[in-house]
Regions:
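Extended, charge-biased low-complexity segments
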Residues: 1-49, 108-160
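Amphipathic protein-protein interaction modules
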Residues: 48-105, 153-217
Length: 218
């Protein structure tokens, strides 16, 4: 586990960014929102103790991030006034912050790709079943949503010279990945859902792939 001075922010484009792209691209070249949410860019930033400081860190680096996102979709020569506005940046992207980092490279600086371990709805159902009969915990879990579970989901920093290796890696190591993610939710491994195959693992967790992990503070 990486307990360092870094955390990771993943940028999720919004419909505002999609509308911006639509204003810049031929109609047939405009991506849909699902495409924008596939392989989102992940950025390594300095870790802070408060959300206010984290927002300040993002604001300090937003122009670099905004520029990169625009170039990803419009090409390196694209220029637009929107990239100078932090308010526009906030409208164009939602942030996912991750500080629970499993490092599989010598240093985080050496990492250039990222996997996010996202809980699925079946895991939330399991968590609710585990607190049945415990009134206070039942009330808490009834208010819980899948988005609560996916906040600060576990991420793995690992490089894949050939992207085809990713699926093989996940299939080979699904069990330790499962154990790492589950240990954050319950230390009673005997009570965990039974996962004895990649198929059963995939019922409880989805893997998001980020082929670009960009370091902003080095």
């Amino acid at each position: 586990m990486h307990q360092g001075s870094s955390e990771i922010v993943v940028l999720k484009p919004t419909t505002v960014f999609l509308a911006f792209l639509a204003s810049q691209l031929p109609l047939n070249d405009v991506p849909d929102l699902a495409s924008l949410h596939t392989d989102c860019t992940a950025y390594v930033i300095n870790k802070h103790d408060s959300i206010e400081e984290t927002v300040e860190e993002i604001e300090k680096n937003f122009s670099t991030m905004f520029r990169h996102e625009i170039c990803r979709w419009l090409g390196n020569n694209a220029r637009n006034d929107i990239e100078t506005s932090f308010l526009d940046f906030l409208c164009c992207f939602k942030f996912e912050l991750h500080s629970h980092i499993v490092l599989m490279e010598p240093t985080i600086e050496a990492g250039h790709q990222l996997l996010t371990i996202k809980p699925r709805a079946l895991l939330l159902d399991w968590m609710r079943s585990e607190v049945e009969g415990e009134y206070e915990l039942e009330n808490v879990m009834e208010q819980a949503t899948l988005s609560h579970l996916t906040e600060n989901a576990t991420v793995i920093v690992k490089n894949f010279p050939d992207l085809k290796e990713i699926k093989t890696f996940i299939k080979q190591y699904y069990r330790p990945i499962f154990e790492t993610a589950m240990s954050r939710m319950s230390n009673q491994s005997s009570a965990w859902p039974e996962v004895n195959s990649f198929k059963s693992f995939s019922q409880y967790f989805a893997i998001e792939i980020h082929t670009q992990l960009i370091h902003l503070h080095y």
